[in-house]
Each structure stands twice: as structure tokens, then as C-alpha cells.
Amino acid sequence: MKQYIFFLALIVLTATFAEAGKKTEILDKVKKVFSKGIAGVADLNNMSELGCPFIEKWCEDHCESKKQVGKCENFDCSCVKLGGK
């Protein structure tokens, strides 16, 4: 009995989306958002691979001028003092 109710509800939902013509529009929007998200992650990955050596070198030079050691993580430069003297 539960299976019949489930399939009946599924048919009603499918018919509702098909009649309104929204089924393909909703799927297209979801696909566009998903593809934009994937492209954004790929772009961010490419930028970090290309930009990290330059930013890390700048960070090391910046912290060296303060007589500290620099470390770059996720485009964030942090300087740390070595020793207590």
C-alpha cells in the first residue's frame, strides 16, 4: 500500500512539473550553477598554484626585513619570531 502511495505522489509531482514546463528550466538552472561552481574551484586552484610561489617569496622577504620567519598559508602571510633573545 505504501508503494502505491509513493508512486502516485511521484506521478503527480512529475505531471505538475511537466505541465508547468518548469522541469527542464529547473534542471538547466541546476546544471548551470553546478558547472559555475566547478569552474570556480578550478580557477581558484589554478590561481593558488601560480600565485603561491610569488606570495610566499614576498612573505619571506617581508618577514626577513623584520628579522622574523615568514610563512604563507592560503594567501595569508604570518611572521614568527625565532628565539627569545
UniProtKB/Swiss-Prot annotation:
Domain comment (free text): Contains 2 domains: a N-terminal domain that is unstructured or forms an alpha-helix in presence of membranes and a CS-alpha/beta C-terminal domain, which consists of an alpha-helix disulfide-linked to antiparallel beta-sheets.
Disulfide bonds: 52-72, 59-77, 63-79
PROSITE patterns for this protein: BSPN_CSAB
Signal sequence region: 1-20
Pfam families according to UniProt: Scorpion_toxin_alpha-beta
Residue span(s) of domain BetaSPN-type CS-alpha/beta: 49-85
Annotated InterPro entries: Long_scorpion_toxin_alpha/beta (IPR029237)
Keyword field: Disulfide bond, Ion channel impairing toxin, Neurotoxin, Potassium channel impairing toxin, Secreted, Signal, Toxin, Voltage-gated potassium channel impairing toxin
Protein name: Neurotoxin beta-KTx 14.3
GO CC, alphabetical: extracellular region
Family affiliation: Belongs to the long chain scorpion toxin family. Class 2 subfamily.
Principal location class: secreted
Molecular function GO terms recorded: potassium channel regulator activity; toxin activity
Tissue specificity comment: Expressed by the venom gland.
Positions annotated as propeptide: 21-37
